[in-house]
Structures are given as structure tokens and as C-alpha cells.
Amino acid sequence: MNTLNLNLINAHSEYLVWLSPNGKYLFKTDYDILYAVDFELDSNPYFTAYWFNLTNLEHQSSPSDPKIPQTIICIIEEFFRQNPDILLYMCSTEGGQQAQRARLFLRWFNGSEQNKYYVARSVEIHGEDSRKEYVAIIVQRSNPQLQNILAVFEKETTMFNELKPQP
């Protein structure tokens, strides 16, 4: 993965973003909650894709803060400027809030400006112990393989669900 340009991120981001020694992009909110963002290469055989990982390092409940999604979007936009690849995201199941996190994440990307440039889809999958989990994909609309990528995503998640026993 190509390194992200922090100057470009910080030119538009509400929160200052910096790179940690272990390669994670960090930012601290007005509520002193430290977040980490990193990207992990996926092993699928079809396309180059990265898992987008967003972690609340304080493990504290975060109040509604519009600066957080704005900062995350700046990071993701820079990811796509540097890497014409695919982002995958699995919502954390911590606290049983995965459905709410999936809706929130999609709202960020299906709203206003992002909808012009990205396609974001989320699907429910059957996880361990019959737990519902949510996986999302984000692809640039300009990607020449867009329809094929979305078809593979749908096929793979459908196949995954068919292989898992349902409650």
C-alpha cells in the first residue's frame, strides 16, 4: 500500500492526523478519545483490497462528534488518491452495536459528496455463534471493474452465509 500524504489529510481534516511508529494513522478528539486507523491487505484472489480498521484506543463511549466522520473521510479519500484499490470494513461487534455501526458507516459514505465518488455497500453475514456481523465494501465509482467487484462481493458474501448454519 502506498503511504498516505498527511499534509493533504490535515489540510482538510477537522482533527490533526499523525502516523504512529507502527504505521497506524492516529487522531485525538476534543473529548480526548484517541482513534487509530490502519489498512490491512486482504488475501482474496480476485482484486487488491484492504481492510479498513478503525479502533477507539480508549475503549470509551464516544459522544456524537461530527468531526470524527469528517476526519475518517479525509483519511479514506487520501487512501483512494494513493491506492486505486478496494476498501473492506467489518463493524466491531463490541457491545452488540454492529448493526448501528454499519448504518452509521454507510450514512457517511452514501451522503452528500461521497456518494458522487464512491459506492458503499453493506451486507449482514452470519458470524461465529450465530452472531450477526456486517461487512462493507467501498469502491471508487471511477473504477473500471466496479460492476465486477460488486458482483464478486455479493457472490462471496452470499456463499459465506450459505455455508454458515443459521439460527
What are these regions (language model features)?
Residues 1-167:
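Non-catalytic substrate-recognition and accessory regions of acyl/acetyltransferase enzymes
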